[in-house]
Regions:
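Short, acidic/small-residue loops that bind anionic groups at enzyme active sites
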Residues: 30, 34-37, 111-144, 189-196
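Glycine-rich oxoanion-binding loops at beta->alpha junctions
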Residues: 43-96, 103-104, 136-143, 147, ...
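Phosphate-binding loop/pocket of nucleotide- and phosphate-handling active sites
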Residues: 250, 303-340
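Flexible, glycine/charged-enriched surface loops at secondary-structure junctions
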Residues: 31-36, 155-162, 214-216, 252, ...
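Short glycine/serine/threonine-rich phosphate/pyrophosphate-binding segments
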Residues: 12-22, 44, 78-82, 96-109, ...
């Protein structure tokens, strides 16, 4: 059997560990593996590399992806779908393992509906893919954000400042919630719960009356209650989203204007995606890769590997990409217990 692997969308710690897991299990099964370069672009343009056990040495701890990645969608390119079909047929690919987030997996699902032998592995540091409890890369991103929050506590206390820490999370606030709770944040603002900037300012004033410095964690997609915060037009990108670094700066500016407290902003940005995966993510990513190779051997096409209740299982790919997974309200209530 001949397997192919691709990595699409944004990079995440653990991608290489997944590739390594696929190759090791496939080799054990007597299968051959190739890796398409730069996501769906490599499939469309027939660009790939051979993958074997020897070539995967050192990948367990290595960040990024040796295959490269793009956000190219073959359905948005002229002849993209047919080009993919020609490539898979020309190379005798029996199973294509697509490792990616919502966009990559949605493409994989559409390809499956057209008869392609495709299956998916969920990848996103945002941990927002439905049907799976944990995606690799999330734990590493939380660790990075938590460390930043911990370091900023001493600066906030030394200067009696408010420190605003913006972390990734365009549509959901998993990273912000977990890192805010683990790092001892004073307030955590996430997309699922629109905030009232007046209430934020009041909470911080109450803290400072008790001589407490403050850390405010803000997910990049956090939204104010409509009508409570004026947002300049140049703060939005072409898709109507507040630009990375935008909401953190806006919140910091409003805090200063409303309270008089000196406020500084730190944007963690892409550092959350980079570098070595944590020990947990190395194990999780490896498990995902091994299970994906087993699914390919079983011809379990149109499905996605999912981590549920401490084990790996298989779920319908269409169901997995049908909706986002939001922050557990009970967990946010726990975080709220320690806010302000």
């Amino acid at each position: 059997m001949k397997l192919a692997v691709l990595t699409g969308g944004g990079d995440a710690p653990g991608l290489n560990a997944v590739i390594r897991g696929v190759v090791r299990k496939a080799t054990e099964n007597g299968d051959e593996v190739i890796g398409f370069l730069d996501g769906w672009r490599g499939v469309m343009e027939n660009e790939f590399m051979e993958l074997d056990v020897e070539g995967c040495r050192g990948l367990l701890t290595r960040g990024g992806t040796v295959l490269g990645t793009t956000r190219i969608n073959p359905f948005m390119r002229e002849d993209g779908r047919d080009a993919c079909r020609r490539t898979l047929e020309a190379n005798g690919v029996d199973a294509l393992i697509a490792i990616g987030g919502e966009g990559t997996l949605s493409c994989a699902h559409e390809m499956y509906k057209l008869g392609f032998p495709v299956l998916g592995v969920p990848k996103t540091i945002d941990n927002d893919i439905g049907s799976t409890e944990m995606t690799f890369g999330f734990a590493t991103a939380v660790d990075i954000a938590t460390e930043a929050i911990g370091r900023l506590h001493t600066t906030a206390e030394s200067h009696d400042r408010v420190m605003v820490v913006e972390v990734m999370g365009r549509h959901v606030g998993h990273i912000a919630t977990w890192a805010g709770l683990a790092g001892g944040a004073s307030l955590t603002l996430i997309p699922e719960h629109p905030f009232d900037i007046a209430e934020v300012a009041d909470a911080l004033q109450r803290r400072h009356k008790r001589k407490f410095a403050s850390i405010v964690v803000v997910a990049e997609g956090a939204k104010p209650v409509p009508g409570t915060l004026d947002i300049p037009e140049d703060s939005f990108d072409e898709f109507g989203h507040i630009k990375l670094g935008g909401i953190g700066e806006l919140v910091a500016r409003e805090i200063t204007e409303r309270t008089g407290f000196e406020t500084r902003t730190t944007v963690r940005g892409y550092v959350q995606r980079g570098g070595e995966p944590s020990a947990f993510d190395r194990v999780l990513a490896t498990w995902y890769g091994v299970e994906a190779a087993s699914m390919a051997a079983d011809k379990a096409f149109g499905q996605m590997v999912a981590y549920q209740c401490g084990s790996m299982t298989r779920v319908d790919l269409g169901e997995a990409v049908a909706g986002l997974k939001y922050v557990n309200p009970d967990l946010y209530k726990v975080a709220s217990t320690f806010m302000a």
